[in-house]
């Protein structure tokens, strides 16, 4: 092979590697800025923030209260518009899509878990978990079948017919995790998912999230104040002065 052919082959191999690397990223934020007007002043919460999340990666986001962690999740999830910059989801320009396209991509590729479970109190655990599938216009029978399977994955198969008020705090949060994962999303955005639980229950719920991340190859972006839980993620980033900084790995 002559030098020109060799160079061309090397270039094609490099391009394939770059393309494969791009496909590894489930979620990316580039130059994301978010500002609010408060009391006549412009308050900048996110400042040229950069973030990448690989497939199956568990990323913890830590920072002081009021530092903008929840705002970051809202922007990453397409629930709030950035003032500048862009978010890509599965390689698509998420924040630049029309509202209908963005909603469809969000419903297909993202799951959400909050500190307070936000379950519908009048619905059973089964129907709460089935709800995202029903929104996708899946039949009631098929949606309930898949919801039952996911409830069994989180150890709540026998509790499927119970309403949220009949479940413990840890059980309600496990239902919320099942609801977030039932659509098999590429990434789950979790805002203080264990913040309302006692230490033992929080550890159980977090173990479940880590196990499901491994078995389902689902990425997680987890906002948490708990350094012990953060240390068990693949990476930790700290939000300070509107900018994300990579933290050194902590001993588990």
Swiss-Prot record:
Catalytic class of the enzyme: translocase
Localization: Cell inner membrane
Gene Ontology CC annotation, any one: plasma membrane
Leader peptide range in chain numbering: none
GO process terms (BP): lipoprotein localization to outer membrane; protein localization to outer membrane
Keyword Lipid biosynthesis: no
Gene3D superfamilies: P-loop containing nucleotide triphosphate hydrolases (3.40.50.300)
Domain ABC transporter residue range list: 27-252
Binding-site residues, ATP: 63-70
Molecular function via GO: ATP binding; ATP hydrolysis activity; transmembrane transporter activity
Recorded topology in the membrane: Peripheral membrane protein
Major location (coarse): membrane
Record region (Disordered): 1-20
Tree of life domain: Bacteria
EC number: 7.6.2.-
Record's keyword terms, sorted: ATP-binding, Cell inner membrane, Cell membrane, Membrane, Nucleotide-binding, Translocase, Transport
Quaternary structure note: The complex is composed of two ATP-binding proteins (LolD) and two transmembrane proteins (LolC and LolE).
Known function: Part of the ABC transporter complex LolCDE involved in the translocation of mature outer membrane-directed lipoproteins, from the inner membrane to the periplasmic chaperone, LolA. Responsible for the formation of the LolA-lipoprotein complex in an ATP-dependent manner.
Family of the protein in this entry: Belongs to the ABC transporter superfamily. Lipoprotein translocase (TC 3.A.1.125) family.
Name of the protein in question: Lipoprotein-releasing system ATP-binding protein LolD
Lineage per the UniProt record: Bacteria, Pseudomonadati, Pseudomonadota, Betaproteobacteria, Burkholderiales
């Amino acid at each position: 092979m002559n030098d020109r052919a060799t160079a061309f082959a090397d270039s094609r191999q490099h391009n394939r590697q770059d393309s494969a690397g791009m496909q590894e990223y489930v979620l990316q934020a580039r130059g994301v800025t978010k500002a609010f007007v408060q009391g006549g002043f412009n308050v900048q919460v996110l400042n040229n923030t950069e973030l990448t999340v690989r497939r199956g990666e568990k990323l913890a986001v830590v920072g002081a209260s009021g530092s903008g962690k929840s705002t970051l999740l809202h922007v990453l999830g397409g629930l709030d518009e950035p003032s500048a910059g862009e978010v890509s989801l599965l390689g698509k320009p998420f924040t630049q899509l029309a509202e209908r396209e963005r909603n469809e991509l969000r419903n297909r590729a993202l799951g959400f878990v909050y500190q307070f479970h936000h379950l519908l109190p009048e619905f059973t655990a089964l129907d709460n978990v089935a709800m995202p599938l029903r929104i996708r216009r899946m039949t009631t029978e098929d949606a309930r079948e898949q919801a039952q399977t996911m409830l069994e994955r989180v150890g709540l198969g026998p509790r499927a017919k119970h309403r949220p008020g009949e479940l413990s705090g840890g059980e309600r949060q496990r239902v919320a995790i099942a609801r977030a994962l039932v659509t098999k999303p590429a990434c789950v955005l979790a805002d203080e998912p264990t913040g309302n639980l006692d230490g033992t229950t929080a550890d159980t719920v977090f173990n479940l999230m880590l196990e499901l991340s491994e078995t389902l190859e689902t990425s997680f972006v987890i906002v948490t104040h708990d350094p012990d839980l953060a240390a068990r993620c693949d990476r930790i980033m700290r939000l300070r002065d509107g900018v994300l900084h990579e933290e050194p790995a902590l001993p588990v």
